[in-house]
Amino acid sequence: MTSQYAGELCTLLVEDNFGELFARIFSTLNRYDRLSFSRLKFYSRLSNAQLRHGLAAMIQQHLVYHYTSYDDGITYYEPNMQSAYYLVRSGKILELIEHRLGKYAATVMSTIMFLGHAQVGYLETLPALRPSNSDVNRASEERGGIHETEEYHGEEARQETEEHRETEGRPNGLNSDYTSSERPALLHPTLKALAGHGYILRVRDAQFQSYADNALDAERTIKSRPDIKALKGKKLDEAVTEGTLELLKERLDGDLTRGLMFNGVPRGAKRRHTTGATEASNKKARVDYAAVDEDEDGGEENEWSDDDFGEDTIPMESGITVRINYEKLDVALRNRRFLELAERDSSPVTAEVYESLLRRIEYQTAKCRDTTEIPREGEEGEHYSVPVPLRAVVEDVDLFLDLAGSVGPMEVSQPINRRGKRPLEETTNGAAHDGTNGGQSDGNRTYEVDQHLCLLAQPPYSLTSKRMVSGLITWTVEFRHLARKLRHLELERIIEARYGDVALRVVRVLHDKGKLDEKRLQEISLLPFKDLRQVLASMQTGGFVDLQEVPRDALRQPSKTIFLWFYDPDRVGNSVLEDTYKAMSRCLQRLRFERSRLKEFLEKTERSDVKGNEERYLSEAELTLLGQWRAKEALLLGEVARLDEMVAVIRDY
């Protein structure tokens, strides 16, 4: 993100969220990239006090990296473009957290996002994080839910009603010196839920430095070790590379999920359990699927329920400093795009089964890509997710979903004899034996979930992949394949919108066949030469296709030259990404201009006595103007959010 328009966009985001001082420092660092304090002061034309206060606050917000050189002892500063860009994605992140963990969790997440990073002890003192009675009641009501939800129990959600009474309203199980004003009842369970899902992480010192500075520092440390100095040649290079990567991982690791996960699921996540009939042996049809149930039912997973860990009253350590884990949130947002892709050609039931698989995979996936650079088309290897056992997916799927009806007609349980009648069921004193039938029904459910996942594994998207691990059926997702598919669909959508369906057909042919001359391209695409040439010329002007000249001799005469048309998805993706940055920055600039035109009117509407009472204090003309402004603002911000989806697909996923 070092291009002109990306830097312009990040500067606008910083100015819109933090003000002119932050924007001036950030734009100066973006222009000159890496500066010492004295040079930054010279270029920004700021005083010492302004610059020191601004840098301290920007480091708090992770908008600026700083590194003190070992050679001269000078501290250098450089902009954190990625963190600045994530300001535009904050609304989607809070919406995702509220959907999964509730409104109070979104409030906690918003507070941490506003502070940049914060100690748990400081969060305990904030009045905004003391839950209201509605939050407490909502947390206690969610205990009986069937769908997978994260919940907080009523006994843990009591809080003090009178501030001067320090000994009342204590949650059960805590020490006598505890007061609800010191530790809000819902704060620590919420922080544990956020940490268990990986949405927040511990702040480490190395996170305030750029990856390049951390890599150089780690390499210098590894080379100074006596055992490394004894090596030479190729072994030395391999040892330094391996040691540097391990040291980098150790220094940058801020994972807080250790101790908060159980069998790959965060503690407190609502789980559905099958009936006890699954323990019965199943010797009938679909033995393989019933065997999956029998092998895994006897393990530790069925021994754990939500109530075992729901009443965890042990608070988090007050000295831990936490921040937002944007890489993990990118994984959650990417899974949501995969789910939208599955909903195009599958039933809602199949999409819900796929959501259960993606949720399991998300818990064990730290980030979207191991490398920060976007890999070129064809050069990135296949990258599969962790294998998820079929039985784990079955447990997470809603018990009331009609799995069989959405796949096909239900099978006849018993054959009909020659007389057209069904045989009598085996009964004892008029009562049927239901032990075997219970096991068979659970085996049928496992089989039906597997059939839904098999439907998702079919072309053209191949959303899932089936594997056998130690004799057990597991399912995975091929991330790089689906990420490429999302990029191709996004680029094809843009081409079709700009140049029509004929251009889309030509691009698909070039992408599938490679470089083609005009005659061969016309034969495959079945288009008239006139239409084909017009489409190729317009797309070449827009930069979506290009032409390569291959001379047959050294004279390079046009009559003896082959002209090959080709489509490069990488180059087109980079061009579209730059255009998207430019469009987002223009939307923000337009929004700022519209605000400046209505500055006095907007200041009036934002007054504390007017806000919420617009009909009382504003005239009819002012109400009309306010409605027009809100519609225009929603239009521009909605366009920025839509463009951010394109950036995420092309760059992040």
Curated annotation (Swiss-Prot):
Biased composition, class Acidic residues, residue ranges: 293-311
Gene3D superfamilies found in the cross-reference section: Winged helix-like DNA-binding domain superfamily/Winged helix DNA-binding domain
GO molecular function: single-stranded DNA binding
Keywords for the protein's UniProt record, in alphabetical order: DNA-directed RNA polymerase, Nucleus, Transcription, Zinc
Region called Leucine-zipper, residue ranges: 580-601
Domain of life, source organism: Eukaryota
An individual GO BP term: DNA-templated transcription
GO CC entries: RNA polymerase III complex
Biased composition (Basic and acidic residues): 138-169
Region feature Disordered, mapped onto this chain: 131-181, 266-285, 293-312, 412-444
A Pfam family this chain is assigned to: POLR3C_WHD
Subcellular location: Nucleus
Annotated family: Belongs to the RNA polymerase beta chain family.
Reported function: DNA-dependent RNA polymerase catalyzes the transcription of DNA into RNA using the four ribonucleoside triphosphates as substrates. Specific core component of RNA polymerase III which synthesizes small RNAs, such as 5S rRNA and tRNAs.
Assembly description: Component of the RNA polymerase III (Pol III) complex consisting of 17 subunits.
Protein name: DNA-directed RNA polymerase III subunit rpc3
Name of the gene: rpc82
